[in-house]
Every structure is written in C-alpha cells, then in structure tokens.
C-alpha cells in the first residue's frame, strides 16, 4: 500500500511539473488555462503533503498532546477551542481579502508567466510557511500578538518600534479593505441585502453549534449554506423591487459609518457567536465559487489571450501600474504569494482558537494555499480577456480618455487591437453603462468569471447576472477581513496600552477591550470616511503605501520566526525561513528605496513611482499655477467687466487645481515619511535577527510552559 501511495504522489508531482513546464516553454500558440489549474492543484497538494508536513514534524515538532491556549485559557470570549474545519474557514476568510483578487489582475499586464511562477512558488515556499510558522509561535506563547512577540524575543526597543509600525500598517490595511467594500456596495441593494443577511444566519449557526446541537458542524453547514443561497436569490428580487431596494441603497459616506459600526460590534462579540460562524459561512461562498471556477475552466477550456510575457512593459512603462518587473511585480501580487497582514491574523484571533497543535498545519499552511489558489483564478480571469479589453478596463482615463473611439485607438496603438464595437458589445452584455477605466482589479475579475460561467450556466442572457454576482462575491470576500482585522488590531492596541498601564493590556477585561476597540475603529474609520467623502483624501492618501508596507511586515515576521528557530536550537533549519525572508526583504527594501528617490529629469518611471519625486513635481506645478493666478489677477484689474468674469472663472479653475495638487503633495509627503519609518523598522529587526542568530544578542526564549492536554482534560472533568 505504501508503494502505491508513493507511486501516486510521484505521478501527481510529474503531472504538475509537466503542466508547469508546458506553460513556461510554450511559444507562439494559444495555451489553455486548464494547464495552469492542473499545475496549481498538483503543486499545492505536493507542497502541503511533503513540505508542509516536513516543517510541521521535522522542523518545529507539533505535539498533539500539548495543550493549546484555547484549551488552557478557555474563556468563551476570545479563547475558544474551535473545530479545525471551522477555524480553517475563519483563517481563510480573514486573510483572503482584496489582495489575491486585485494583485494578480494588475500584475497580468506583464503577461501570465511571471505572475504564475511567483504565485505558485511563492505561495508554497514563502506565504504558507510564513502564515503557518507565525501561527505556531503565537500558539506557543498564549496567542500573543506579533508586536508583543518581537518585543519578548528581540528586545524591548526593537519590539516597541515594531509595535508602532505594525499598528500603522494594520490601520492602513483595514481602511483599504473597508473602502473596497464601501465602493462595491454603494447603491447596490442586491449586494447589501445579501451581506446583511449573513449576519443573522451566522449568529444562528453559532448558537446552533454551541447550544442546540453541540459539535454538529455538518448540520449547521447545510442549514447555513441553504440560507446563504436563498439570501443571494432573494437579494436579486429585492434589487428589482423599488420599495424594498430603497431600504438597502446607501451612498458611500453612509456605508462608511455602517462598516465602522459593524467592525466595532463584531470585534466585541464572542468569537463562537459571530466571527467564527460568519467566516465559516463566507468560506462556503468563497471556496464554492473558486471550486466551481476551477471545474468550469476544466470544462470550458478557455485560452490565454494575454501574452506569456509582455516584454514591452517589463521596464515599468505599463499603463496599469508603474514600476519594473523587479521588484514591483512581487509587491503588486502581494497576498497571492505572501502577505504581512496574514501574520497579524495568525498572531491575533486564530492562535487563540486552535483546539489541537496539529491543526496548525491545516489552518495556517492550508489556508494560505487556498488563498494562493484564489490568486491563480484571478490571474486566469485577467488573462483570458482580450488584451484590448483588459487594458480598456484597467487603464486610467488620463491615458485612454473617456471617449470610446479614442480609447480603442490609443489601446490599438499600444499593439492590442480592439474596436469600439467590441467594447460596446461586452458592456451591453453585462448590463453596465461603461467598462472604460474600471480600475482596481475587481471589475476585471468579475468579467473573467462572467466569460467562463455564462458558457455553462445561462448563456449570453445571464452575463449580467454573473457579472453582478461576482461583484457581490468580492464584497463578501473582503468584508470578512475587516471584522477579523478589527479584532486583531484591538489586541495590538491592548498590547501597546499595557506597556503604559498594565490593566489595559488584559484581554479578559471587558472595559479595556472596549477602549481598544474604540481606538481601533476610530483610527481606520477616520481614513475610511475621509476617503468616502473625498476621492483625493483619507485612505486614498495612504493607498500607494499598501504594497510595500505589507511586504515589509511579511519580511519582519519571517525574521522573528528565524530568531525563535535559532533559540530553539533549530539553526540547521533556518533556511526554511531565511531564504524567503531574504528574497522578500531585498525586493521590498529595493521598492521602498525607489519610492523615496528625488526627482530626476527624464527619469519618467522613477518620478512616477517615487513619492518624493511626485511631491516635488506637485510643488513645482503649484508654484507655476500660483504665478499664473497672479498674472491673471493683474490682467483682470485692467480688463472690462465682461473679461473680468472670464478671468474670475480661470482663477477658480486654477485654484481647484492647486487644491487637488496640494492634496497629492500632502499624501506623497506622508507616504514618503511612513515608508522611511517602515524601512528603518525593518532594518532594526534585521539587525536584531542577525545578532540573535549569530549569538551576539542573548535574549532567552519566551515560550509558554508545557501543559499536557490529557492532564488538563482530566482536571477540567
């Protein structure tokens, strides 16, 4: 039997390698997306079965007889032993936000091959390792947060600085995720109704699994899934009824307050009551759509229309995002391969809910592989589109304009022939008014889903349904990361406040938790609301910093794990974390340096990427406009009454331009300052890690004492 298993695993590996090589080496012919789906499945299965288990049992030594914090601290609020399937769902729902949907779509401008390689290789060797090991070290330290662990294991000063940096990054990430949800649900009664219905459904599931039928996860799953499908179905009916639709139609500022209230309340409720069952419910939809997409691709067999490698954009001149393939492809893909945000979840809610140590492999490593699979689906959705359509959707109006004929002409001149009629027909098929410059990645993913699923379910008549269903799916996909992120940031704030006044750091204290939640929601809520009322303010100011800061956080997390492995006497296994850490940090710090370079004449890409250069150009443009206004005012004094009206209008237009440029200048200066702070923090963690690994810095290991699970169970009985 063992021989047969080895033969089976060998053929799985061989199949995955064959498909991977075919995608990499094929030239000049159309390539089916089937090869990427098969290759990804094989690589993930082999990665989990061999590399994941190697790390779990050879490197760190998971012990099923060792009690977890959830068992020891079980308080029914934050520390709750949770079924591993339910906890996997929570972890996946919490980490799988906008990143795996948006990043690969944007990166597709460079072709499918570079993104495919990084998503698959990075996901297995970097991202899944990162999530799993951070979950492990937090579990072994009573579920402590990332910043607190850096403080304990790498020194007070390093930890204190890191805690501030991590909190800043966390606020940026939550506000960005919330903004994506607000934009998706604004004036969308179908989407808002469906997402609103998941709240009572999740609460019912939580009560059902804890009190009505304890442990009956399967029963609750079936009931919850049926109710979810009904809410999706009736959400469409609600959107078609003017009276009902009115109650679920809100603008962005109102939705911003609603999301803040949602995040505030959900972070205070017991995890078994709402957070865990809601994430479990959301995972049904998330995983369901991804699995259906995988089978649909195998059935429809769409071809990649995007080139394997878009050589003309490797230098960073692409219309979708600026920056060369290294480092900005890796920074742009972000969560699809590795994400620092995951470390915050893996050291926030999840380690406090693990029922058994051995579940950490499935929850940590497995959930990241699932997210990497989502990124692969997003990449496929982008690359099966006609390149002309892809660039019409993802290029800014500043590049292609708002006129259909002009946009088609510009894109065709780039080498991707597309006609206005083709764009018009697709726009009509999905029931939209325009698809030009629908940037951000989400509409492109929705288009890809539509083009695949309509060939199996419903035909052309159902393209509008599938498009709007995909938009709804993305909103639900992302919202789960907001509530988990808020709860995690609450723990982080309590860690910081606990250093000032110890009782505030007690996570069992209701009032301390309430204060921390208010601070958390106030911070990310401010940026969210400002972004909702001003397209140039709030979170839009910090948005460009997301990619670099997120990857820096991932690098810092891997360095922390490396330092702990060295203290555990596992130096021979340091390559497991140091190899991905070194690659991620080189790419990220190089990208960070490019973002703070000064203006250079003729260096178009550098000036576009750099916050400092952009701020300098903003200042120069403001000075020019101020001089022009002074000149116009001088002319106005000597002009007729009729000309004065004309001059006044010109002055108002230029003052508005100055206002917009001032917003941009402030945002870029703030981004540059924060980027420098995050890079200095990263360098501080690097120095501490090196010192610990070579024995120059001696800080004792702060692992929690061993508690035997069987003895604990006997005492509790």
Segments predicted by a language model, with ranges:
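Hydrophobic alpha-helical segments and their helix-loop junctions in multi-pass secondary transporters
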Residues: 206, 210, 226-257, 265-267, ...
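Low-complexity, proline/glycine-enriched hydrophobic segments characteristic of transmembrane helices
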Residues: 240-241, 386-454, 536-537, 592-666
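Membrane-interface "cap" regions at the ends of multi-pass membrane proteins
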Residues: 1-14, 46-101, 283, 324-328
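Flexible loop linkers connecting adjacent transmembrane helices
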Residues: 53-80, 106, 120, 129-158, ...
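Membrane-interface helix-loop-helix modules in multi-pass membrane proteins
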Residues: 20-26, 31-32, 79-141, 152-156, ...
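Loop-to-transmembrane helix boundary motifs in multi-pass membrane proteins
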Residues: 153-171, 366-373, 439-441, 460-470, ...
């Amino acid at each position: 039997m063992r021989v047969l298993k080895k033969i089976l695993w060998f053929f799985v590996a061989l199949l995955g390698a064959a498909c991977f090589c075919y995608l990499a080496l094929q030239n000049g012919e159309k390539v089916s997306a089937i090869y990427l789906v098969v290759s990804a499945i094989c690589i993930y299965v082999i990665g989990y079965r061999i590399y994941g288990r190697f790390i779990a049992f050879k490197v760190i030594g998971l012990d099923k007889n060792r009690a977890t914090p959830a068992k020891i601290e079980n308080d029914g609020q934050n520390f709750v032993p949770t079924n591993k399937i339910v906890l996997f769902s929570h972890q996946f729902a919490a980490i799988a936000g906008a990143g795996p949907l948006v990043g690969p779509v944007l990166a597709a401008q460079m072709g499918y091959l570079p993104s495919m390689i990084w998503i698959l290789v990075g996901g297995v060797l970097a991202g899944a390792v990162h999530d799993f090991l951070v979950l492990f070290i937090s579990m072994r330290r009573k579920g402590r947060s990332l910043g607190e662990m850096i403080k304990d294991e790498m020194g007070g000063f390093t930890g204190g600085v890191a805690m501030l940096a991590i909190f800043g990054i966390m606020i940026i990430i939550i506000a960005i995720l919330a903004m994506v949800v607000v934009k998706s649900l604004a004036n969308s009664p179908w989407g808002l109704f469906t997402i609103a219905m998941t709240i009572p459904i999740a609460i019912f599931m939580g009560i059902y699994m804890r009190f009505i039928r304890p442990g009956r996860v399967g029963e609750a799953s079936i009931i919850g899934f049926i109710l979810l499908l009904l809410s999706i179905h009736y959400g469409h009916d609600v959107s078609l009824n003017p009276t009902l639709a009115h109650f679920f139609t809100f603008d962005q500022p109102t939705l911003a307050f609603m999301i803040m209230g949602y995040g505030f309340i959900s972070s205070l409720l017991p995890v078994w009551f709402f957070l865990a069952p809601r994430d479990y419910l959301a995972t049904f939809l998330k995983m369901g759509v991804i699995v259906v997409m995988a089978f649909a691709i195998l059935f429809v067999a769409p071809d990649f229309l995007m080139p394997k490698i878009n050589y003309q954009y490797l230098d960073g001149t692409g219309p979708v995002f600026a920056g060369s393939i290294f480092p900005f492809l890796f920074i742009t893909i972000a969560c699809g391969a590795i994400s620092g945000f995951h470390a915050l979840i893996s050291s926030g809610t999840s380690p406090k809910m693990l029922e058994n140590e051995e579940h950490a492999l499935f929850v940590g490593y497995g959930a990241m592989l699932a997210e990497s699979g989502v990124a692969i689906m997003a990449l496929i959705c982008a690359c099966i589109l006609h390149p002309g359509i892809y660039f019409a959707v993802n290029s800014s109006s500043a590049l292609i304009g708002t006129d259909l004929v002009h946009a088609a002409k510009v894109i065709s001149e780039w080498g991707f022939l597309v006609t206005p009629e083709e764009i018009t027909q697709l726009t009509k098929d999905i029931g939209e008014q325009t698809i030009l410059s629908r940037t951000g990645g989400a509409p492109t993913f929705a288009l890809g889903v539509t083009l695949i699923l309509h060939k199996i379910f419903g035909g052309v008549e159902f393209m509008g349904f599938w498009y709007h269903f995909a938009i709804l799916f993305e909103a639900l996909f992302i919202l789960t990361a907001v509530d988990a992120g808020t709860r995690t940031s609450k723990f982080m704030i309590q860690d910081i406040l606990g250093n000032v006044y110890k009782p505030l750091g007690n996570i069992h204290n209701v009032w301390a938790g309430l204060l921390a939640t208010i601070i958390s929601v106030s911070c990310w809520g401010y940026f969210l609301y400002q972004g909702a009322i001003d397209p140039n303010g709030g979170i839009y100011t910090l948005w460009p910093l997301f990619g670099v800061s997120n990857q820096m956080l991932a690098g810092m997390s891997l360095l922390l794990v490396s330092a702990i492995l060295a203290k555990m006497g596992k130096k021979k296994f340091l390559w497991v974390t140091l190899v991905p850490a070194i690659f991620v940090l080189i790419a990220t710090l190089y990208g960070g340096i490019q973002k703070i370079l000064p203006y250079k004449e003729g260096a178009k890409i550098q000036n576009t990427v750099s916050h400092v250069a952009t701020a300098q150009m903003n200042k120069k443009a403001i000075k020019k406009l101020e001089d022009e206004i002074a000149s116009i005012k001088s002319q106005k004094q000597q002009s007729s009454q009729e000309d004065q009206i004309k001059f006044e209008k010109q002055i108002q237009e230029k003052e508005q331009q100055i206002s917009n440029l001032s917003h941009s200048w402030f945002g870029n200066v703030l981004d540059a300052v924060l980027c420098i702070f995050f890079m200095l923090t990263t360098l501080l963690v690097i120095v501490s890690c090196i010192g610990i690994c070579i024995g120059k810095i001696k800080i004792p290991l702060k692992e929690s004492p061993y508690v035997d699970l069987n003895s604990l169970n006997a005492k509790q009985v």
